[in-house]
């Protein structure tokens, strides 16, 4: 705009990031915690041979979905995972699962309590709603910049960026699920002298479980959508295969890695949906 000074917003943000990087000890603690979770998941995946992993997944699917249509999913799991194994993508797939599961676990641990807090206070909800809107609408690439500044490169900054991008659905659906619990049920719990914690654990959370699971499903899918972006800052996995294929203009390699990501996405999505149906039936 002519004759109007430019607001130095970018400079302010740079100074804020530079100031936060001075808290190196704090970020080292977070790095060690997240790194420990990542190493634990990867150790388990490396310990289990591919054939045993497939068998365990089939049994898990059968148990979760024993009352529903399960054979189509089981056949897809077996064929899809055998294809990934045959293409020599197994290690990449387990690294991708490590990133997704770690991000989803952290998003769940932070998001559910935050959603409960929002459900209990309209003021808190009014404060965090625009924050969640900001987190979901900001391009995911932008999160890589502060993640690298605070945590360096590797799996940890990839997990942090994925958590920020994937957490809002869990928070929103937890808040929504608790608020949708029938007031008659809440009043009945009050009439029996339930404490706020008893009311939360025995009435509100069980009734909101289905809605919360829908949010968790969305968070898992969003975390999986970050695998290619996270590969740009050193997070290993199938996303790295896609990223390298783009750099080499390798259409075949990129599509094959993309198909592997799609297989993982479908399996995770169908499993969480089956778990949600099982929770509803109970």
From Swiss-Prot:
Its main location: membrane. The keyword Chloroplast does not apply. GO terms for biological process: amino acid transport; carnitine transport; choline transport; glycine betaine transport; response to cold; response to osmotic stress. InterPro entries: MetI-like (IPR000515), MetI-like_sf (IPR035906). It is a multi-pass membrane protein. The keyword ATP-binding does not apply. PROSITE patterns: ABC_TM1. GO terms for molecular function: amine transmembrane transporter activity; amino-acid betaine transmembrane transporter activity; carnitine transmembrane transporter activity. The chain crosses the membrane at residues 44-64, 70-90, 99-119, 140-160, 220-240, 251-271. This is Glycine betaine/carnitine transport permease protein GbuB. Belongs to the binding-protein-dependent transport system permease family. The complex is activated by an osmotic gradient or by low temperature. The lineage of its organism: Bacteria, Bacillati, Bacillota, Bacilli, Bacillales. One of its GO terms (cellular component) is ATP-binding cassette (ABC) transporter complex. It comes from the Bacteria. The complex is composed of two ATP-binding proteins (GbuA), two transmembrane proteins (GbuB) and a solute-binding protein (GbuC).
């Amino acid at each position: 705009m002519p004759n109007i000074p430019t607001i130095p917003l970018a400079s302010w943000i740079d100074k804020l990031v530079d100031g936060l990087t001075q808290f190196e000890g704090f970020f080292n603690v977070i790095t060690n915690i997240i790194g420990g979770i990542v190493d634990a998941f990867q150790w388990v995946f490396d310990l289990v041979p591919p054939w045993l992993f497939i068998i365990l997944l089939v049994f898990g699917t059968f148990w979760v979905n024993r009352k529903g249509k399960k054979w189509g999913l089981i056949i897809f799991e077996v064929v899809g995972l055998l294809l990934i194994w045959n293409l020599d993508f197994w290690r990449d797939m387990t690294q991708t699962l490590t990133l997704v599961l770690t991000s989803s676990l952290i998003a769940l641990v932070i998001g559910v309590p935050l959603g409960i807090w929002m459900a209990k206070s309209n003021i808190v909800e009014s404060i965090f709603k625009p924050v969640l809107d900001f987190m979901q609408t900001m391009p995911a690439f932008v999160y890589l910049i502060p993640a690298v500044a605070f945590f360096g490169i590797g799996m940890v900054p990839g997990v942090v960026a994925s958590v920020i991008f994937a957490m809002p659905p869990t928070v929103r659906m937890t808040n929504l699920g608790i608020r949708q619990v029938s007031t008659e049920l809440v009043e009945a719990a009050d009439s029996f002298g339930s404490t706020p914690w008893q009311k939360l654990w025995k009435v509100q959370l069980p009734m909101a479980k289905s809605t919360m699971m829908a949010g968790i499903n969305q968070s898992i899918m969003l975390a999986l959508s970050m695998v290619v972006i996270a590969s740009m800052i050193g997070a290993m996995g199938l996303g790295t295969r896609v990223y390298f294929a783009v750099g080499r203009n390798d259409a075949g390699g990129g599509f094959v890695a993309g198909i592997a990501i799609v297989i993982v996405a479908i399996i995770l999505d169908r499993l969480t949906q089956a778990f949600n149906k099982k929770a509803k039936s109970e």
